[in-house]
């Protein structure tokens, strides 16, 4: 099962990137990679998606364009959008 605290901890190093752009740190990309590893099943993906969405909603300064580019910038094939508006049931 996915624990949102774990997802939050994975994303915390990404906050400066998500709010300011630039290049994500190694710690941030490691976190993105760990979320991908956690989300092994379709249900885990939905749960992780809801955690990511909730985390994104706690930071109103997150730039959606930057957030959506995060997996690409980290070279991680993440099937979970980093967004405040994702419909996680559609994943």
UniProtKB/Swiss-Prot annotation:
Keywords: Disulfide bond, Lipid-binding, Transport. One of its GO terms (molecular function) is lipid binding. Pfam families: Tryp_alpha_amyl (PF00234). InterPro entries: Bifun_inhib/LTP/seed_sf, Bifunc_inhib/LTP/seed_store, Plant_nsLTP. Disulfide bonds join 4-51, 14-28, 29-74, 49-88. Belongs to the plant LTP family. Plant non-specific lipid-transfer proteins transfer phospholipids as well as galactolipids across membranes. May play a role in wax or cutin deposition in the cell walls of expanding epidermal cells and certain secretory tissues. Binds to both saturated and unsaturated lipids, with the highest binding efficiency for linoleic acid, followed by linolenic acid. This is Non-specific lipid-transfer protein 1.
């Amino acid at each position: 099962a996915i624990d949102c605290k774990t997802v939050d901890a994975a994303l915390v190093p990404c906050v400066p990137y998500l709010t300011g752009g630039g290049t994500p740190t190694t710690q941030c990309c490691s976190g993105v990679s760990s979320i991908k590893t956690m989300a092994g099943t379709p249900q885990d993906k939905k749960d992780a998606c809801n955690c990511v969405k909730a985390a994104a909603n706690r930071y109103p300064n997150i730039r959606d364009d930057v957030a959506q580019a995060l997996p690409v910038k980290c070279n991680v094939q993440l099937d979970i959008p980093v967004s405040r508006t994702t419909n996680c049931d559609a994943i």
